[in-house]
Amino acid sequence: TLRVAEKVKSINPNIKTIHYVAPQVWVWREGRVKKFKKFLDHILLLFDFEKKYFDKENIPNTFVGHPLLEQESKDKIDLSNIISNDKKIISLFSGSRSSEVNLLLPILINFINMMNTKFDNFSFVFHATDENKNLISEKINNTNVKNVEVISDENIKKQILNKSTFAVSKSGTVSLEICNAKVPSIIIYKMNFLNFLIVKMLVKIKFANIINIINNKEIIPELIQKECNPKEIYNSVVYFLKNPELM
């Protein structure tokens, strides 16, 4: 959409352009925001902390909030036919893109197997999208992993998250929803090594998770790249489960 706005502005400079969801200038190194000023007349911001970046360049902006934090639950659904009432829930978010699922799902499946070896009172729920539910289900069905459900219904996912004891999530704005539900969590992410090196050269932030970025410190633990492995995830989750006062 930024390219469209730039093209429209080049054709007719008098057309006013309003962009919903600010370009993440706080992620990338300096310089990009000056370019946006040339073809964006107003920006609608999801996060209040973004204002300072656009105010600095005198780009008109308005903070409108994030829709994930404003969604209301619909009618309550009986989850007993999905999750056993005597099981604690750990919600898992392996990403929306197939490339993310392909990379993170095997790691999470191995983590679940490790948990099942030591504990018998947990159910693991993958929060899928309509687009990737089949991909996740097929990969899980090709393993011997137990105590796993894959859910794509938005209302059911929200209620399951609200009942969760813990969450393991790919970095992204879903961490806001997890935080809003007051569910303790850790953030994981992994990409191929070449892409990781490229990103390291381009980005200027220290954290992968939006909550940590906003606060400029690690509030939610992050397991990135080589630390994103079944053993580290298992150790982190078990540590917090055994020390609930830290959650």
Please name every model-derived segment.
Residues T1-M247:
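Nucleotide-activated sugar donor-binding and catalytic core shared by glycosyltransferases
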